[in-house]
C-alpha cells in the first residue's frame, strides 16, 4: 500500500473520530475527556499542515461544531465562531507575535455551553445553542427561566437600548450547586452528572422549562454579534454596555497592554483556577479594538483576533483505600479505586477508574498507596500512578476476583487475548440487568424518567423483573412488591403511578429508540436511526443479511455482525416478542419516512450550502435511502457543490461525474432525478 493511501486513511480515521466526539460534545454527551479530544484535534491539524492537500472545506478543522440533533433550528444573525487553542507559553507567544495590538482583553474560558440571544427593541425574541456556528437549537423557552438572562433590557444615557443586538454568552452551573444537585440525584437513585458542563447542557435541552429551573443555571456574557444603533469601539466598551443593559459579565476580565502581562495572567489563573465561581479550563485572549478585529478577520472556524490558552487537566494526590470492581450492562468487569475524598476540577471525588486488571498491574498501584489522579471531564477520574517515595511497606497487592461480585459466575475474557474480563451470565446477572434497565430508560433510548439506578436495582432484587422482557407488562399489582414504588403502608406511590404512565408513553417511542433500548452492542442512536430509516421495521431488519445491514450508511460490518449475533440468542428474541405483544413500536411511522427517492444512489456533498448544514444534508440523503459518502470515487452518482468546494469538485470533474448545485440537490431529494 502506498504512503499516500496510508496518509489518506490516517486522515479519514482522525477526521471521523473528531466529528463523532465533537457531535457528542455539543449534544451534551461527551465520551472522552476534553484533553483527549484536544489531542485528536491537534493531530489532525498537524497532519493537514504537513499535507495541505488533505484540508478541504468539509474537514473538521474548517468547521465550528456540530448541528444539534432532533430540534427546531434557528439561524444565527452572525456566525458564532469557535476558538483556536494553544497549550504552551511558546505557542501563545507565537500568536501574540503574529497578532500585535495596543491592548488585549483577557477573560476566563468558562467550561459551559454557548448561547446566542437576540433582542429586538430591547426584548428577548430568540435563544439558541451554538450548534454548528451557523444554525443552533431553539432553546428560547428554556432561556427565559434562567434568572441571569433578562427578558427586557434597561438602558442608560451612555448606553441606550439598541434596536437590535445579538448577545453571546456561556450557560454554566456553579460547582457548589452542582454538588448539591448530584447529591440529591444520588439520594433519588438517579444517575449523577459527569460535570457541571454536562448538567448545564442537558438542562438547556429539557422539554419542560419548569424542569430547567431546577437545574439552577447561570449565564455570563462574552461577546456580541449583529447589532443596530450600537457601535462600540472596543471589546471592553461592549462589555460595559452589556452590563448597563442588565447582563452579567465576568468580573475576572482584565485589559492589558503588553504580551508580558498576557503571559502573567495565564500563569496567575492556572494557579488560581478554583478562585472563580464557575468552572474554567483556560484563558481567552482577545484583541480589544473592534476595528482591528474586523481587519484581522477569521478562518472558516475561528477568529484570528482571539485565542484560547487551554490548561492541562488538574492532577492531585490522595490515599488509595481499596480497589473494588463494578459490572456493566455488557458484563464488562471494571476495577475502580476507593479513595480518601479529594477536590479536583470543580468537584469532590472518592472513586477513580482503573479500567482493567492489567492496567492495575501496569500502573503498579497498591492498596494503601498515595496515588496521583486527574479528572478531565469524566465523572470518575483516572488514576495515573503511585507516589513511590510515599510508600512505607504497609501497602498490599490487589487480586482480581475469579467470580462475578454480583452473581458469583466465573469471570473470563470474551475471546482469547482480551484485556477486559466479563461475567458471562448476561441474562440473569443482577448488575448487568440493572444497568440495561437504566440504559433503556435513558434519554438516548426510551426516556423513562421514573426508572433510575436505584429503582432498576429494586425491581430486580424484589423479584418484580427477571429480565427486561417483562418491563412493559408491569402493572400496579406487580409494583406493590417493590419498595421504591410503594408507600410505607404498602400502596402504590406517586413514582409508581408515574412509571406506569412513562411505560405507556414509551410504547409509542420512535422505532430507532427501541433499537437503542435493546442494548445491542455498538448500536447507538446514530446507527439505530440509519437502520430504522432504511429497513423500516423489525421484521425486515431481522431478515436482512450482514452485507445488507453493513451497506447502510453509518453502520458498517462490525455493527452489522453484532446486530445479527444479538438475535441468535433465544432470550433476546423473547424480549422482542414480548415487547411486540405489549404494543411497543416495531416499525417506522410511514408518515415520518420520506419517499425513498435515493435508493441505491451515492451522493457526496462538498462546500457550504445555503439551506443545509453538513449534517442536515447527510441526513436528507440517508433518510431517502441514499448513501452519503465523504469521498469522491467512480462509484459516486452525484456530487453536490456549494461555496468553497475545494478538491472534491475537481476530482468529480476529472472522473466525469454529475455535478449539482443546491437547487439540483433539492430536486434530486424530491424526485431522485437531477
Curated annotation (Swiss-Prot):
Cofactor: Mg(2+); Mn(2+)
Binding-site residues for NAD(+), renumbered to this chain: 34-38, 82-83, 107, 130, 170, 286, 310
UniProt-listed InterPro entries: BRCT_dom, BRCT_dom_sf, DisA/LigA_HHH, DNA_ligase, DNA_ligase_AS, DNA_ligase_CS, DNAligase_adenylation, DNAligase_N
Catalytic activity field: NAD(+) + (deoxyribonucleotide)n-3'-hydroxyl + 5'-phospho-(deoxyribonucleotide)m = (deoxyribonucleotide)n+m + AMP + beta-nicotinamide D-nucleotide
Active site per UniProt: 109
Domain BRCT, first and last residues per copy: 593-674
One MF term in the entry's GO annotations: metal ion binding
Keywords, comma-separated and alphabetical: DNA damage, DNA repair, DNA replication, Ligase, Magnesium, Manganese, Metal-binding, NAD, Zinc
EC number: 6.5.1.2
GO BP annotation list: DNA repair; DNA replication
Superkingdom field: Bacteria
Binding site for Zn(2+): 404, 407, 423, 429
Extent of the signal sequence: none
GO-annotated cellular components: cytosol
NCBIfam families cross-referenced by the UniProt entry: dnlj (TIGR00575), PRK07956.1 (NF005932)
Function: DNA ligase that catalyzes the formation of phosphodiester linkages between 5'-phosphoryl and 3'-hydroxyl groups in double-stranded DNA using NAD as a coenzyme and as the energy source for the reaction. It is essential for DNA replication and repair of damaged DNA.
Database matches in PANTHER family: CHROMOSOME TRANSMISSION FIDELITY FACTOR 18, DNA LIGASE
Family that this chain belongs to: Belongs to the NAD-dependent DNA ligase family. LigA subfamily.
This protein's name: DNA ligase
Source species: Corynebacterium aurimucosum (strain ATCC 700975 / DSM 44827 / CIP 107346 / CN-1)
Amino acid at each position: 500500500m502506498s504512503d499516500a493511501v496510508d496518509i489518506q486513511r490516517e486522515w479519514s480515521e482522525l477526521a471521523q473520530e473528531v466529528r463523532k466526539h465533537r457531535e457528542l460534545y455539543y449534544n451534551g454527551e461527551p465520551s472522552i475527556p476534553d484533553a483527549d479530544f484536544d489531542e485528536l484535534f491537534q493531530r489532525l491539524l498537524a497532519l493537514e499542515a504537513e499535507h495541505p492537500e488533505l484540508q478541504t472545506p468539509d474537514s473538521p478543522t474548517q468547521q465550528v461544531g456540530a448541528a444539534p440533533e432532533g430540534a427546531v433550528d434557528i439561524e444565527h444573525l452572525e456566525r458564532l465562531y469557535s476558538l483556536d487553542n494553544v497549550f504552551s507559553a511558546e505557542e501563545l507567544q507565537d500568536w501574540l507575535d503574529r497578532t500585535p495590538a495596543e491592548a488585549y482583553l483577557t477573560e476566563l474560558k468558562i467550561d459551559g455551553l454557548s448561547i446566542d440571544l437576540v433582542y429586538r427593541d430591547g426584548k428577548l425574541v430568540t435563544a439558541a445553542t451554538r450548534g454548528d456556528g451557523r444554525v443552533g437549537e431553539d432553546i428560547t423557552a428554556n432561556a427565559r427561566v434562567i434568572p441571569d438572562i433578562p427578558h427586557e433590557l434597561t438602558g442608560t444615557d451612555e448606553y441606550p437600548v439598541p434596536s437590535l443586538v445579538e448577545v453571546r454568552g456561556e450557560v454554566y452551573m456553579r460547582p457548589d450547586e452542582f454538588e448539591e444537585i448530584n447529591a440529591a440525584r444520588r439520594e433519588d437513585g438517579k444517575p449523577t452528572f459527569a460535570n457541571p458542563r454536562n448538567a448545564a447542557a442537558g438542562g438547556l435541552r429539557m422539554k419542560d422549562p419548569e424542569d430547567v429551573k431546577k437545574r439552577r443555571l447561570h449565564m455570563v456574557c462574552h461577546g456580541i454579534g449583529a447589532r443596530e444603533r450600537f457601535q462600540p469601539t472596543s471589546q471592553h466598551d461592549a462589555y460595559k454596555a452589556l452590563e448597563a443593559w442588565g447582563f452579567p459579565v465576568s468580573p475576572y476580565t482584565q485589559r492589558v497592554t503588553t504580551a508580558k502581562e498576557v503571559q502573567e495572567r495565564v500563569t496567575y489563573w492556572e494557579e488560581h483556577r478554583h478562585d472563580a465561581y464557575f468552572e474554567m479550563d483556560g484563558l481567552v485572549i482577545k484583541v480589544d479594538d473592534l476595528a482591528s478585529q474586523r481587519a484581522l478577520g477569521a478562518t472558516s472556524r475561528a477568529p484570528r483576533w482571539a485565542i484560547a490558552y487551554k490548561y492541562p487537566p488538574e492532577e492531585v494526590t490522595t490515599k488509595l483505600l481499596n480497589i473494588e470492581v463494578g459490572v456493566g450492562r455488557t458484563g464488562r468487569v471494571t476495577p475502580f479505586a476507593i479513595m480518601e475524598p479529594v477536590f479536583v476540577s470543580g468537584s469532590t471525588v472518592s472513586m477513580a477508574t482503573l479500567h482493567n486488571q492489567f492496567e492495575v498491574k501496569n500502573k503498579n498501584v497498591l492498596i494503601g498507596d498515595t496515588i496521583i489522579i486527574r479528572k478531565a471531564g469524566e465523572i470518575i477520574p483516572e488514576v495515573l500512578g503511585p507516589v513511590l517515595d510515599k510508600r512505607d511497606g504497609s501497602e498490599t497487592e490487589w487480586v482480581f476476583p475469579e467470580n462475578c461480585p454480583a452473581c458469583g459466575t466465573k469471570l473470563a475474557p470474551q475471546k482469547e487475548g482480551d484485556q477486559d474480563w466479563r461475567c458471562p451470565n448476561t441474562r440473569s446477572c443482577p448488575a448487568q440487568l440493572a444497568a440495561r434497565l437504566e440504559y433503556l430508560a435513558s434519554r438516548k433510548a426510551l426516556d423513562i424518567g421514573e426508572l433510575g439506578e436505584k429503582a432498576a436495582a429494586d425491581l430486580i432484587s424484589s423479584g418484580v423483573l427477571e429480565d427486561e422482557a417483562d418491563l412493559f407488562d408491569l402493572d400496579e399489582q406487580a409494583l406493590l412488591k417493590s419498595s421504591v414504588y410503594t408507600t410505607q403502608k404498602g400502596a402504590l406511590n406517586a413514582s409508581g403511578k408515574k412509571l406506569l404512565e412513562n411505560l405507556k408513553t414509551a410504547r409509542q417511542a420512535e422505532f430507532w429508540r427501541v433499537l437503542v433500548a435493546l442494548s445491542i452492542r455498538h448500536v447507538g442512536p446514530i446507527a439505530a436511526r440509519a437502520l430504522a430509516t432504511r429497513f423500516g421495521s423489525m421484521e425486515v431488519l431481522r431478515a436482512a443479511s450482514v452485507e445488507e445491514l453493513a451497506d447502510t450508511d453509518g453502520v458498517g460490518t462490525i455493527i452489522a455482525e453484532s446486530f445479527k449475533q444479538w438475535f441468535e440468542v433465544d432470550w433476546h428474541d423473547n424480549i422482542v416478542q414480548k415487547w411486540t405483544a405489549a404494543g411497543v413500536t416495531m416499525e417506522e411511522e410511514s408518515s415520518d419516512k420520506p419517499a425513498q427517492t435515493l435508493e441505491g444512489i451515492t451522493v457526496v456533498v462538498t462546500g457550504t450550502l445555503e439551506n443545509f448544514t453538513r449534517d442536515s444534508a447527510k441526513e436528507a440523503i440517508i433518510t431517502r435511502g441514499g448513501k452519503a459518502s465523504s469521498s469522491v470515487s467512480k462509484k459516486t452518482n452525484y456530487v453536490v457543490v456549494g461555496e468553497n468546494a475545494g478538491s472534491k469538485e475537481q476530482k468529480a470533474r476529472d472522473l466525469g461525474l454529475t455535478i449539482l448545485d443546491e437547487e439540483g440537490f433539492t430536486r434530486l431529494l424530491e424526485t431522485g432525478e437531477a
